[in-house]
């Protein structure tokens, strides 16, 4: 992995799981746009969610979008104020995630929109650990600094995520020291 050089041009990233059948998706889009982040990554994005987001400030304020809607919980979308130079849906341990390369003022940046399986059963826990390992394997091969953002269905108290967030990979929530840091469970 590479570390972005210190510049006066930070890149702010916000992530949200839209919760699949959220009746307030357009409102959520407005609230996320109001955060003023440079990049917004969303999980559980369907065609219906995208249609709702088209009526929000997120759609108008973020001219660059990569979308990979899917039925149920596997869809994703990445919204950016920076040009997208490449985007593709990738399979990590059999689960789709959205990889997007951006042209930022500080240089190229790769954003991986993550949504791992919730480790609720033994089978799911194995798949979840495999997905986290696949993410760890993906980062060193990246041609540019990489942000892993999304719903990891974990906390840093879970050993596989703690292992991913060690070494050269840093947890932005811990570095920033403020904001919402939980990715599971966080239903309110």
Task: For each feature predicted by the language model, list its residue ranges.
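Soluble catalytic domains of enzymes that build or remodel membrane lipids, polysaccharides, and related
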Residues: 9, 13, 19-34, 39-188
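N-terminal membrane-anchoring alpha-helices
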Residues: 1-7
């Amino acid at each position: 992995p590479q570390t972005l050089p210190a510049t006066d041009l930070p890149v702010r990233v916000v992530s949200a799981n839209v919760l699949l059948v959220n009746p307030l998706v357009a409102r959520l889009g407005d609230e996320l746009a109001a955060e003023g982040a440079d990049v917004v990554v969303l999980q559980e994005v369907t065609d219906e969610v995208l249609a709702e987001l088209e009526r929000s400030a997120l759609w108008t304020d973020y001219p660059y979008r990569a979308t990979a809607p899917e039925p149920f919980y596997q869809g994703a979308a990445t919204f950016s104020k920076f040009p997208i130079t490449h985007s593709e849906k990738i399979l990590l341990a059999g689960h789709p995630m959205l990889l997007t390369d951006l042209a930022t003022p500080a240089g190229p940046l790769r954003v991986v929109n993550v949504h791992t399986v919730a480790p609720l059963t033994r089978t799911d826990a194995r798949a979840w650990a495999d997905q986290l390992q696949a993410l760890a394997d993906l980062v060193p091969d990246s041609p540019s600094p990489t942000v892993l953002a999304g719903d990891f269905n974990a906390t840093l108290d879970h050993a596989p995520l703690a292992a991913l967030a060690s070494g050269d990979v840093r947890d932005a929530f811990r570095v920033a020291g403020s904001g919402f840091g939980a990715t599971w469970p966080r239903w309110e």
